[in-house]
Amino acid sequence: MAAAAAAASVASQAQAVLRGRLCDQAVVHSALRSSPDTNYSKLKYLVASSVSEACNNSVLLLGPRGCGKAAVRFSFLVYSSAPLSAVFSDAGVVFDEMCQWAIYDFTLWVVSAWTEVVDMVLDDLKKDHPDAISVIRLNGMLHSDDNCATKEIARQLCLEHQLSFSKMASSDDNTEFMIDMLRECGLAHKTIIFVLEEFDLFAQGKQRLLYSLLDAMQSLTSQAVVIGVSCRLDADQLLEKRVRSRFSHRKLLFVPSSVDSLQRLMEHLLALPEDSPLPTKYVREYNARITSIFNDKKFKGILSSLTDADATTSHILRFLFRVVSYMDIDSGLLSMQSFMNALSSMQRQPKMDSLQDLSILELYILVCMNRLEDKEKSSYNFITIMKEYKSVQDAYKTSDKYSHTVCFRAFEHLLDRELISFADNKGRNQALEYRPVKLLISSRELAESLKLNTTCPAVLQKLLDRERYM
């Protein structure tokens, strides 16, 4: 009994350590700081040189959502020096070392919603130049209106420099105040860094804010850096000629993480450090087990299934947190079953259940749509699907032939079940047959449903497998 209690105690301590690592952005993003080729290093060099050399600069961070444009941002700016318990107590959440699910959900909100590379850079620079940096943050979803944006800039500048803010000031007054502050901060050798989230939304309308800001930065007395963050790769092309001429045209492109890099991240996060308070023998045994799991072919399949739907860092963190929760308390070690259980708990079961109730014809329609997407058809509708269905019938000489009317009813049923949807809101006055549609399930989900469906014709499984492995 005593030995079992001791093992359970060690397992609980290990879970607490691992959860702490998953909740600590310094640990999550430490790999970014170690390599000189990362966007983090490039952005830090750019901003640091602007601060030290007292010059103006501008840069765009472009890439799809969830690929880390903003990690190279919040991780440390606000909460880096505070212990995790302090973060949650400030938010009105009681921190428990065993970490309840509700607390974890809040942690991930902090990790992903405040986002991630800019904050890391700003935190490092604030440590190096504590009195030489002032940060102003705007979001295009909230401040795309020029009047609202200049007012928010004035408010943040007043708050940063302990000045009184006038809510009644006009837009022109706020713009003039911003220009004056840029000049005064430049004379005081202090850099103002403007972080513009959803930058493409600022590049609409007359773009008066961007013009005023970039034009003021042309002055020798000003000292500022503009960092634009956008998921649109053509964000710089949206700028007017007068604005574009004042922009530096520096761009850092972010791409989604590869499967190999995600596996390295998982290995890094799940490995117990040698200097942890846990017994050395246990740490070595645990780390050896983790290495063995990651080298297993089954794990490759789990990772592939996980990243098919979502390959973002926040999704990986949610998965790993569940893996830790499925740790075997008796042995205190993770197993392949821990990863499989975590994956099962994250997969969208309602859609899988819906797929089990479909008719043979509806499965044919889904497989035909999947084939069209694999052929990289940019747009297709019911008529296109029927042509694909006919080509399948002609190629395989199957007996599963249905009339156009019956097929259309099955198509409407799939729309009602929300397994497929219209590609856009255009053409609402068009007949349903001609409106573009898209699949709302992945090829892996479709393949799993075909395997579980006992009435599914073998030809459908062949068709899907052929497309997946071509």
Swiss-Prot record:
A Gene Ontology biological process term: response to sucrose
The protein, known as: Origin of replication complex subunit 4
Subcellular locations according to the entry: Nucleus
Recorded family membership: Belongs to the ORC4 family.
Protein keywords: ATP-binding, DNA replication, DNA-binding, Nucleotide-binding, Nucleus
Claim: Cytoplasm is one of the keywords in the record: no
UniProt tissue specificity: Expressed in the shoot apical meristem (SAM), leaves, ears and roots (including root tips).
